[in-house]
């Protein structure tokens, strides 16, 4: 299991300051919508200047018609990131088109599909998708697996089931990890590190418990000890 640190601070400068404090740790860095829209490709380059060995997960959750998603995926290749994601609800045709397009490249990033956002509760999710989170997450994961993707974004509660219906090597990345029982904020389906580990999660994403800490490096050290 690997740790991915969410770079969700209000400014580029604050994110870079955080990265500087944790530069000696073997962790992934997650660049989300706000940070990428605000700071762009230059931010990705600045990360590599601090530590060229950092691996970057570009969390943009692509969702569009198949050709547009595939075009965007090709553009992401040029950014040199190590992982990005799409929405599974865009459908199998869109996901397949993304993977077919990426076959042109000798080296491509890991591609994950978002199943159910961890901010959803059962009631909200059911009104939109007409089914339970667990059933729909399994279906989305199966669609992603059959479309040739490398894994999915899901909560820790769906990870074991998804691996059972796909493959043990099919990756799961879980946001909403609260390693020391912190407030869950706007996340609904949260878990701790031990639960994620027992669910055979491949990547855990931790944000607020790290960047809100006075000593983020120490928090990372403690999380890595649990991993």
Swiss-Prot record:
It catalyses: orotidine 5'-phosphate + H(+) = UMP + CO2. One of its GO terms (cellular component) is cytosol. One of its GO terms (biological process) is 'de novo' pyrimidine nucleobase biosynthetic process. The keyword Signal does not apply. It is an enzyme of class 4 (lyase). SMART domains: OMPdecase. The active site is at residue 61. Pathway: Pyrimidine metabolism; UMP biosynthesis via de novo pathway; UMP from orotate: step 2/2. Its EC number is 4.1.1.23. Substrate binds at residues 8, 30, 59-68, 118, 178, 187, 207-208. Pfam families: OMPdecase (PF00215). Keywords: Decarboxylase, Lyase, Pyrimidine biosynthesis. GO terms for molecular function: orotidine-5'-phosphate decarboxylase activity. Belongs to the OMP decarboxylase family. Type 1 subfamily. Homodimer. Catalyzes the decarboxylation of orotidine 5'-monophosphate (OMP) to uridine 5'-monophosphate (UMP). This is Orotidine 5'-phosphate decarboxylase. It comes from Sulfurimonas denitrificans (strain ATCC 33889 / DSM 1251). The lineage of its organism: Bacteria, Pseudomonadati, Campylobacterota, Epsilonproteobacteria, Campylobacterales.
């Amino acid at each position: 299991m690997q740790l991915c640190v969410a770079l969700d601070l209000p400014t580029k400068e604050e994110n870079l300051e955080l990265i500087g404090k944790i530069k000696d740790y073997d962790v992934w860095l997650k660049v989300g919508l706000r940070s990428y829209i605000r700071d762009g490709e230059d931010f990705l380059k600045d990360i590599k200047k601090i530590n060229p060995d950092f691996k970057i997960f570009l969390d943009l959750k692509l969702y569009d018609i198949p050709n547009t998603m595939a075009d965007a995926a090709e553009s992401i290749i040029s950014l040199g990131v190590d992982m990005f994601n799409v929405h599974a609800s865009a459908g199998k045709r869109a996901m397949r088109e993304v993977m077919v397009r990426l076959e042109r490249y000798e080296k491509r990033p890991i591609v994950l599909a978002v199943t159910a956002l961890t901010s959803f509760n059962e009631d909200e999710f059911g009104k939109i998708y007409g089914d339970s989170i667990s059933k729909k997450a399994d279906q989305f994961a199966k669609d992603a697996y059959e479309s040739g993707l490398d894994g999915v974004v899901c909560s820790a509660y769906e990870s074991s089931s998804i691996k059972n219906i796909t493959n043990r090597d099919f990756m799961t990345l879980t946001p909403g990890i609260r390693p020391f029982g912190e407030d869950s904020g706007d996340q609904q389906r949260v878990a701790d590190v031990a639960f994620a580990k027992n669910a055979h999660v491949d990547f855990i994403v931790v944000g607020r418990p790290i960047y809100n800490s006075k000593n983020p490096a120490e928090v990372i050290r403690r999380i890595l000890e649990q991993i």
